Design a protein with these regions (language model features):
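Short, flexible helix-loop junctions that flank or precede catalytic/ligand sites
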Residues: 1-326
Length: 326
């Protein structure tokens, strides 16, 4: 089978990821579980020769690993991670949705559109790898593109969803191709007149510091972070800095954070996967706790903040059960 046929078959079976290696049979991931795939994988090294441009080939030969995205004719766009190991070369492929979903399809908490109306501040989308953070960010961009007149600048590694400017002017930059690092791209973005900056990932303290500065200086910053809960995300941001910097960082977060939306995927009754959400909103009480370093109390704030639009994973699960999804 060629890759177009493999992707078509994978879509038919609700597969989220493909794992290809010349040293063993192909595997795919369905509803979070790894299974042996019912096809023979094409030669991985040949695929990379076909898919990578000259600059990517150089990075691949130099570093032995590469993240990129590829569009296959007539099928889905794929996010790819190629890497070498003891047995040879492997490709991990994530099948991206056919189109950018909207917030109503994902069924994010009802207050999310109001949060996106903020003129500035930081909105974090967090969760484990493969839980749909990029899809949620894409839905947020899609919402703004339909409802606001903004300049949106994205910094991604790699570019996953391709946007068409509608009401918004959307410009997408890929790390390694259009700028060297997230920090370098973000530093440049502050001179490029964006209203909204999308950061594919907050990877280090320099990027976090620049994101907070951007959020404080009149930009709405949307970013992802690898944590399993909303409260843990705040702790992770603060802990990225040395002790002497934690207090000013907490002060910045207390004033610039708008919300943390954490998510995870569960298998639903339709043999698919459904997103559950946890939402922390930066109310005055939340900001005071962050400023004072009482981060351990944030989980309680979420549990008691339903009236302000907050949501726990348990409340989200109850909502899904009422819909008949769980």
């Amino acid at each position: 089978m060629n890759m177009e046929e493999i992707v078509t078959l994978s879509v038919k079976h609700n597969v989220s990821d493909l794992h290809l290696c010349n040293a063993w049979p192909a595997r795919w991931r369905k509803q979070g579980r790894m299974e042996t795939a019912p096809f023979t994988a094409p030669d991985v090294d040949r695929l990379l020769l076909d898919w990578l441009n000259d600059a990517q080939q150089y990075q691949w030969r130099t570093h032995g690993q590469l993240d990129f995205a590829v569009s296959l004719s007539g099928t889905r766009r794929l996010r790819a991670s190629a890497f070498t190991h003891q047995q040879g070369t492997s490709l991990a492929l994530r099948l991206l949705p056919e189109r950018c979903p909207d917030l109503a399809e994902i069924q994010t908490p009802p207050i999310v559109p109001a949060l996106l109306a903020s003129e500035n501040g930081l909105i974090l989308v967090t969760g484990a790898t493969g839980c749909g953070k990029s899809t949620t960010l894409a839905a947020m961009v899609g919402y703004l593109n339909q409802h606001a007149d903004k300049h949106i600048l994205t910094l991604e590694d790699p570019i996953e969803y391709r946007y068409t400017s509608k009401r918004c002017l959307i410009q997408q930059r890929e790390i390694g191709q259009h700028c060297a690092t997230f920090a370098a791209g973000l530093r440049a973005a502050l001179r490029e007149d964006p209203d909204v900056i999308l950061l594919g990932e907050l990877r280090d303290s320099e990027t976090i510091r620049l994101a907070l500065t951007a959020a404080e200086t009149g930009h709405l910053v949307l970013a992802t972070l690898h944590t399993r809960g909303a409260a843990q995300a705040v702790e992770r941001l603060v802990d990225s800095f040395p002790t002497q910097e934690k207090e000013p960082v907490r002060s910045q977060l207390a004033s610039s954070l708008r919300a943390v939306l954490s998510q995870k995927l569960e298998v639903d009754r339709q043999d698919g996967r459904v997103a559950l959400f946890e939402l922390l909103i930066n109310t005055p009480a939340t900001g005071n706790l962050i400023r004072e370093g009482k981060l351990h109390q944030l989980a309680h704030v979420i549990q008691t903040g339903q009236q302000q639009g907050m949501m726990t994973f348990a409340q989200s699960a109850q909502w899904r059960q009422a819909q008949g999804r769980l």
